[in-house]
Amino acid sequence: MALEKSLVLLPLLVLILLVLGWVQPSLGKESRAKKFQRQHMDSGSSPNSNSTYCNQMMRRRNMTQGRCKPVNTFVHEPLVDVQNVCFQEKVTCKNGQGNCYKSNSSMHITDCRLTHGSRYPNCAYRTSTKERHIIVACEGSPYVPVHFDASVEDST
């Protein structure tokens, strides 16, 4: 009797373990929108021309693990303002896609560029603060930024 129950429960247990093994990796995966926020949003601080800002932020935001990310931009505006860019001027992305949008107004940003000769694991960045229009790629529901495409100067 106990053996029969075990034989019935064993396939069920195997099925549950297979489903958990298939679902679990996707549970911990960062969404593109969350990745955008981690890599590009720094709403809580004002633009900082401190020369160590990029070195600290690139490490803190996990962009120097396994390699040095060559270029990154942080936006110092409220998240809702950056999300609203997805409903502003539509432009073509650098890769030719049609899901990019340019901000109507300039935003405070910090550009981080890997310094010449800098090599992993000693990633060193040049910090420069600017006021620029940003261009972001948007997707999803809700429609939100998932990629920082560029920053451009005011054309006036």
Swiss-Prot record:
Leader sequence segment: 1-28
Protein residues bound to substrate: K35, R38, K69, P70, V71, N72, T73, K94, R113
One of the record's GO molecular function terms: nucleic acid binding
Active site per UniProt: H40 (proton acceptor), H147 (proton donor)
Pfam family name, one: RnaseA
Ranges that cross the membrane: none
Keywords: Disulfide bond, Endonuclease, Glycoprotein, Hydrolase, Lyase, Nuclease, Secreted, Signal
Catalytic activity line of the entry: an [RNA] containing cytidine + H2O = an [RNA]-3'-cytidine-3'-phosphate + a 5'-hydroxy-ribonucleotide-3'-[RNA]; an [RNA] containing uridine + H2O = an [RNA]-3'-uridine-3'-phosphate + a 5'-hydroxy-ribonucleotide-3'-[RNA]
Recorded GO CC terms: extracellular region
Tissue: Pancreas and other tissues and body fluids (indicating it may have other physiological functions besides its role in digestion).
EC number: 4.6.1.18
Domain of life: Eukaryota
GO biological process assignments: defense response to Gram-positive bacterium
Classification via InterPro entries: RNaseA, RNaseA-like_dom_sf, RNaseA_AS, RNaseA_domain
Function, in words: Endonuclease that catalyzes the cleavage of RNA on the 3' side of pyrimidine nucleotides. Acts on single-stranded and double-stranded RNA.
Similarity comment: Belongs to the pancreatic ribonuclease family.
Quaternary organization: Monomer. Interacts with and forms tight 1:1 complexes with RNH1. Dimerization of two such complexes may occur. Interaction with RNH1 inhibits this protein.
Protein name according to UniProt: Ribonuclease pancreatic
Gene: RNASE1
